[in-house]
């Protein structure tokens, strides 16, 4: 009987040791797995893209600390971005954050497939983006469009003001973080003036006061990063200063 009890105790101890060893192996393996990078999707028009906007500069600030999913497309408005299927791609990319910036192609003169009303259809489009991003567990962040670098007696004309104001209202109503790039860009451009602002224009045969040179992209991306540190610190801390 004593031999049987001793055998049982030895077996129990060996079993416990095996369980603890196995648990330790799995724990070590889990610790060794690389952490999933934060995924940041960019939804917008050409001023958000890699080649003509602040997209590439933003991705550089994010660096290896996250994954930038560039889904902005030139010529898109808050209406056409959905109609073209690009918003579906944003949702399918399963991002943690979505930066949403539209306005330039929502203005009159862009045609019925793109134009929106800043009092009705534009805020409705933004609100729908917000709701659908949240439905998949992503955090939407609204970004007002940067101002065009068109001056009148030292002041920016600010044609995009109604769309920027509409975005602010949606952000307030939906309790969504807002990067007011429109206001920040106007303040900067009027401070440095037309001559210095021209350095933000991309090189080309025709004047372009809408899109960005590499320097302009870096400046706008830095403003966005600065604002994100205020309104969405969890994302902002991932962006280099």
PLM regions: where:
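Alpha-helical cap/lid subdomain in secreted, periplasmic
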Residues: 6, 84-241
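N-terminal secretory signal peptides and thylakoid transit peptides that target proteins
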Residues: 2-19
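N-terminal beta-loop-helix "entrance" segment that forms/cooperates
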Residues: 76-81
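Hydrophobic h-region of N-terminal signal peptides that target proteins for export
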Residues: 20-27
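Serine-esterase "nucleophile elbow" of acetyl-processing enzymes
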Residues: 28-75, 86-94
């Amino acid at each position: 009987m004593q031999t049987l009890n001793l055998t049982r105790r030895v077996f129990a101890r060996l079993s416990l040791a095996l369980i603890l060893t196995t648990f330790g192996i799995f724990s070590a393996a889990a610790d060794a797995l690389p952490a999933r990078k934060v995924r940041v999707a960019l939804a917008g028009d050409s001023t958000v893209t890699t080649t003509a906007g602040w997209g590439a500069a933003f991705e550089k600030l994010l660096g290896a600390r996250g994954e930038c999913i560039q889904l902005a497309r030139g010529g898109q408005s808050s209406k056409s971005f959905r109609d073209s299927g690009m918003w579906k791609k944003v949702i399918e990319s399963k991002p943690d954050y979505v930066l949403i910036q539209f306005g330039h192609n929502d203005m009159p003169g862009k045609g019925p497939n793109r134009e929106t009303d800043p009092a009705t259809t534009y805020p409705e489009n933004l609100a729908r983006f917000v709701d659908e991003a949240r439905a998949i567990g992503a955090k939407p962040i609204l970004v007002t469009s940067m101002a065009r670098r068109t001056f009148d007696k030292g002041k920016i004309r600010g044609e995009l003001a109604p769309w920027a104001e509409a975005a602010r209202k949606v952000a307030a109503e939906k309790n969504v973080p807002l990067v007011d790039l429109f206001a920040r860009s106007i303040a900067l451009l009027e401070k440095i003036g037309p001559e210095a602002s021209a350095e933000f224009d991309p090189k080309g045969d025709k004047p372009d006061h809408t899109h960005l040179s590499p320097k302009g992209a870096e400046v706008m991306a830095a403003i966005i990063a600065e604002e994100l540190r205020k309104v969405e610190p969890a994302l902002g801390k991932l962006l280099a200063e």
